[in-house]
Amino acid sequence: MMQPKKTKFRKAHKGRIHGVASSGATLAFGQFGLKAMEPDRVTARQIEAARRALTRHMKRAGRVWIRVFPDLPVSKKPAEVRMGSGKGSPELWVARVKPGRVMFEIDGVSNQIAREALLLAAAKLPIKTRFVERIAE
């Protein structure tokens, strides 16, 4: 699973996701992509599950690019622990995803296989997504 090798701080504030994606909103590498339509936090496990669904359906043909990285630690207190006594320890890593962000890109497969594979990957994610393809120049 994906997580940073080293971070400046062990714990992070929750924060909010405002606005739409300005960077990473267009296809940069592949021919087809999966674009986020709503804001949310996507965990490293969800990204990995989507990647596995993609590669399995493509039968390891073509190439996959993951355009989001879980760089935000989410802390959690153990079960049945009273309030107070500090913030919990980091439990998982998430990526903040804004609407319009291209999350996955694929290339080297047909339109039909790409659409099916990205639809399977979208089922593993907690947000609404849209299939996008590069317009032929």
Swiss-Prot record:
Organism of derivation: Bradyrhizobium sp. (strain BTAi1 / ATCC BAA-1182)
The protein's name: Large ribosomal subunit protein uL16
Gene that this polypeptide is encoded by: rplP
Keyword flag DNA repair: no
Record family assignment: Belongs to the universal ribosomal protein uL16 family.
GO function term, MF aspect, one: structural constituent of ribosome
Gene3D superfamilies per record: Ribosomal protein L10e/L16 (3.90.1170.10)
Keywords, alphabetical: Ribonucleoprotein, Ribosomal protein, RNA-binding, rRNA-binding, tRNA-binding
NCBIfam families referenced in this protein's UniProt entry, alphabetically: rplP_bact (TIGR01164)
PROSITE patterns: RIBOSOMAL_L16_1, RIBOSOMAL_L16_2
A Gene Ontology term for the protein's cellular component: cytosolic large ribosomal subunit
Quaternary context: Part of the 50S ribosomal subunit.
Function in brief: Binds 23S rRNA and is also seen to make contacts with the A and possibly P site tRNAs.
One Pfam family, short name: Ribosomal_L16
InterPro entries the record matches: Ribosomal_uL16, Ribosomal_uL16_bact-type, Ribosomal_uL16_CS, Ribosomal_uL16_dom, Ribosomal_uL16_sf
GO biological process, alphabetically ordered: translation
